[in-house]
Amino acid sequence: MGRPRDPQRIEARRAEVGAATLRTISALGIEGASLRAIAQEGGFTTGTLAYYFSNKQEILLFAGRTVLRSLVARIAAALSDHTTLRSLEKALLNELPATSDTRLGWQIWLAFTARVPSDADYRQEHEQRYAEIRILVRNNLNAAARAGNLAKGIDRAAEVDQILSLFDGLGLHALLEPEHFPPVRQRRQLRRAIRALERPRPTRKGEPM
């Protein structure tokens, strides 16, 4: 089968390979995602894979990039209202491994991040996407501060790192200790951390403290 010349067709086929790769990683782990296994999962031949990617490393990196870019896009979309911390809360709560779909995403993410320390390409992709997420969170905190929704005296740069560290930690421990970190606990911990940054609401006369 010849390689399509239409750029959109090429990208569509690469996306199909990427999706098959993610399914393979989910079933067999990243080490089990051989070219043969990926081809079998997607209904391709190994020759077809060679039309669209130079090697297995490029296929795996493409699949990992797809996961991270999708995460960034979803968080950005959820932060359409940049002035409230509740929008940030909702954006991150939706991504915790509290459902079968999000849990699968975290399992794949964990498989890829295991390669970050020893692989420059994976490290570059990871750093770039996390830089984008930090910008989104920082912009939310800055906008909340301008709107008067952020508590006074908050070190925003430090809070960005703290929020994302908690987010990653909850996701990781939810995979490793699912009984100790069930969905309700994941959400409660993250919600508590973000709401602690909110400016206290003025107490109305007659309202209990």
Where are these regions (language model features)?
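Helix-turn-helix
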Residues: 16, 20-58, 62
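Amphipathic alpha-helical segments used for helix-helix packing
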Residues: 87, 100-123
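Solvent-exposed, amphipathic alpha-helical segments
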Residues: 16, 20-27, 74-78, 108, ...
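Short, basic, alpha-helical segments at the C-terminal edge of helix-turn-helix-like DNA-binding modules
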Residues: 65-71
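Hydrophobic alpha-helical connector segments
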Residues: 62, 76-105, 156-163, 187, ...
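Short coil/turn segments at alpha/beta junctions that flank glycine-rich nucleotide-binding fingerprints
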Residues: 27-31, 102, 147
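Hydrophobic/aromatic-rich alpha-helical bundle segments in the mid-to-C-terminal region
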Residues: 6, 121-127, 131, 145-209
